[in-house]
Amino acid sequence: MNLVSVPISSLSNIKVSANWMSATGNNVDDLNLRLGVQALSDFCVDLNIAIPVGKDSLSMSTTWDSEEHSFEVNSPLSGIITAVANVNDVRQAITTEYQNTAHPLLAYVFPDENLALEKNAIPDISPDAIKSMFDFLQENIRNKSILALHDVSDGGLLCCLSELCFTNKIGITWEVANNSSTDEIFTLEEQLKLFPFAETIGAVIQIDAKNYDLLRSSAKQMDISMCQVGKPVGKRISIKTKNNNVILDKCITDLERAWSQTSYHIKAMRDN
């Protein structure tokens, strides 16, 4: 999803580098590496994406002794995936920076199959859902219906909205209402618990409000859900229900300061 804001002619033009890190040398870690590589390979074959290069770091363990004990630390299996693609015209690319429009609106788009992840279900995503999301977003970037975009990843929807606020130094006001895409499966209360922090595939896009109905209709035909998540305005993130019950109301400066704390403390320890 990190590449989707740049116009790419097709998914098959994307090339992937895979860097696997593991503490191999035992049956468990060797098997996990084999299963991980196979899963990535199968997924990329379904997407028609090649993995021409990669790198392996398979000695990710260390041991040391003290006077009384021996210690061993093993790295868990991880795959670092880097994707690149040729771009015909970089001037068509969009970013997280809002564009001037008469009636700015933010919308959350995600595959319909996300709605099947009830309660504690293990997240998964099908190649068909990736293709649909890619095609929908790319088409509407090219025709300039999508003006800005940020993918939903670590931290879920709420972090995505917060990062948009930090980038643009503009807040968001969002009145949460029952959404026809979700209210058949989740109550409003469950939506508020699940969706703000769900780290499932999706994106928040800036559009002009006059195009919302047309875009939502187009998304529905591609098995993609789309719902409004507020308007960029002011200097606060203000999320309320239709009954004016406050869910979140924070100054974006305070949120950005809290958001930066982890990086600040890591840097302070590392650079000391």
Where are these regions (language model features)?
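A glycine- and small/hydrophobic-rich beta-loop-beta segment
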Residues: 108-112, 119-149
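Glycine-rich phosphate/pyrophosphate-binding loop regions near the starts of catalytic domains
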Residues: 1-124, 196
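A general structural motif
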Residues: 82-88, 125-134, 176-188
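Glycine-/charge-enriched secondary-structure boundary and capping motifs
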Residues: 29-79, 142-272
